[in-house]
Regions:
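Structured all-alpha helical bundle cores of eukaryotic regulatory proteins
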Residues: 1-164
Length: 164
């Protein structure tokens, strides 16, 4: 179910034209919340849009409004439900909304090795694939970022740009 939710949130993220950091923070909020709270399957979409609402407020200059999330869920949830879920999520997470994202690490690593745009875009794609896969949660964000950049370089057969 997590993979289906994340896949749908990627589509929502694209529809709203949000920055990549918002998507990565959204997934982090979902995973940290679900570590602390058991949720029934039919409420998982609510958790997802709530996390994206919070992440948008943190990362975006112009965040989507609550009504946008009501619309995107085809009115499965009302404005008050989303706002109530936002309060509950923030309390459960002790208002800790920031995190070290694999995307942030990737940006830093790519600038260090002076990665060309094609390789960087491929690494971003590989990193986005890791968001959907539950097994990737056990890996540190810096490891996911370096692995995606390394793999992107190998796919295009670029010599190893990593310092020894």
């Amino acid at each position: 179910m997590r993979a289906i939710l994340i896949d749908w949130l990627v589509e929502v993220h694209l529809k709203f034209k949000l920055v990549p950091e918002t998507l990565y923070l959204t997934v982090s909020l979902i995973d940290r919340f679900l570590e602390k709270e058991t949720i029934m399957r039919e409420r998982l979409q609510l958790v997802g849009v709530t996390a994206m609402l919070i992440a948008s407020k943190v990362e975006e200059i112009y965040a989507p409004e609550v009504q946008d999330f009501v619309y995107i869920t085809d009115r499965a949830y009302q404005r008050e439900e989303i706002l109530d879920a936002e309060r509950k999520m923030l309390v459960k997470l002790d208002f800790q909304t920031s995190h070290f994202s694999s995307y942030g690490f990737l940006q830093r690593y790519a600038s260090l090795v002076d990665s060309d745009p094609f390789i960087l875009n491929m690494a971003r794609y590989l990193l986005e694939l890791s968001l959907v896969e539950y097994k990737m949660l056990k890996h540190h964000p810096s490891m996911l970022a370096s692995a995606s950049l390394y793999l992107a370089q190998k796919i295009v057969r670029k010599p190893n740009a990593w310092p020894e």
